[in-house]
Amino acid sequence: MARTTTLGRGGLLTWLGVALIVIVLDQLTKTLILGHFQYGDARHVTGFFNIVRVHNTGAAFSFLAGASGWQRWFFVGLGLVAAGFIVWMLRSQGHQRLFAWALSLILGGAIGNVIDRLLHGYVVDFLDVHWAGWHFPAFNIADSAITVGAALLILDELRRVRRG
């Protein structure tokens, strides 16, 4: 049986490489935002999209953002536990391509946001989608990767159920 740590198709290192690409893109874009925007700045891009700089001390949709500070370490711990579980899953399920893509995107996004929490105490969000005065909560590349990964997990499960 082939080792799952090889660079071959479906090997653990392949999927960790995908996660690393997400982490690098996420951190690069956040570094650019931190270097060129002040907190609260916004730049109009289109009629439905802005680049902003906001800090999220909570989770998705700023859940628990108003808590007293304990949530920083809670989400760091949760992210690290999730990362460990995902790596374990990739070691055994890396041959299932869609599933592994999904997990790799989620892994990269989770680690990207954990890095922010460790470095800054908050997650840097900067993508602002809006329509007719309604703004979706700002998000970042890591959040996008997690969302796409979750959608791929659902798709993978639907395909698995359909196959019987």
UniProtKB/Swiss-Prot annotation:
Locations listed in the record? Cell inner membrane
EC number assigned by the record:
3.4.23.36
Q: Which UniProt keywords apply?
A: Aspartyl protease, Cell inner membrane, Cell membrane, Hydrolase, Membrane, Protease, Transmembrane, Transmembrane helix
What GO MF terms are annotated? Answer: aspartic-type endopeptidase activity
Task: Give the source's domain of life in one word.
Answer: Bacteria
Q: For this UniProt entry, what's an example GO CC term?
A: plasma membrane
One GO BP annotation here? proteolysis
Provide the catalytic activity annotation.
Release of signal peptides from bacterial membrane prolipoproteins. Hydrolyzes -Xaa-Yaa-Zaa-|-(S,diacylglyceryl)Cys-, in which Xaa is hydrophobic (preferably Leu), and Yaa (Ala or Ser) and Zaa (Gly or Ala) have small, neutral side chains
Q: Where is the active site?
A: 125, 143
Membrane-crossing residues? 5-25, 70-90, 98-118, 135-155
The membrane topology noted for this protein in its Swiss-Prot or TrEMBL record is: Multi-pass membrane protein
- What is this protein's function per UniProt? This protein specifically catalyzes the removal of signal peptides from prolipoproteins.
Q: What is this protein called?
A: Lipoprotein signal peptidase
Q: Name the source organism.
A: Methylibium petroleiphilum (strain ATCC BAA-1232 / LMG 22953 / PM1)
What taxonomic ancestry is recorded? Bacteria, Pseudomonadati, Pseudomonadota, Betaproteobacteria, Burkholderiales
The gene coding this protein: lspA
